[in-house]
Structures are given as structure tokens and as C-alpha cells.
Amino acid sequence: MKRTFQPNNRKRKKVHGFRARMSTKNGRNVLARRRRKGRKVLSA
């Protein structure tokens, strides 16, 4: 059986990266929420 996690750094950045988050209103909400919570790492 194929594993569900097939690592790919390009896809990782495109989907979960900082610039991807900043590009949409909801993504910015995610970053704001993580800042408020005090996360050391905001995005991939």
C-alpha cells in the first residue's frame, strides 16, 4: 500500500508556505491566529 505522505518541498511551500498564507485573507487570518497563540514557527 502506498503511504499517504509523499514528501515534496515545492508542494509544501506552495500550499503551506508564508507567501501562500499571505496571498489570501483567510491565510492572513491563520498567521494572525498563530501569532496570537505565540507559535515560534508561523508557517512551513
UniProtKB/Swiss-Prot annotation:
Xref: PROSITE patterns: RIBOSOMAL_L34
Lineage top rank: taxon: Bacteria
KW Ribonucleoprotein (keyword) present: yes
Entry GO CC: ribonucleoprotein complex; ribosome
Biased composition (Basic residues): 1-19, 31-44
GO molecular function term, any single one: structural constituent of ribosome
Span list, region Disordered: 1-44
Keyword Coiled coil appears in the UniProt entry: no
GO BP, one annotated term: translation
Keyword line: Ribonucleoprotein, Ribosomal protein
Pfam families: Ribosomal_L34
Family: Belongs to the bacterial ribosomal protein bL34 family.
Protein name, UniProt field: Large ribosomal subunit protein bL34
Organism encoding this protein: Oceanobacillus iheyensis (strain DSM 14371 / CIP 107618 / JCM 11309 / KCTC 3954 / HTE831)
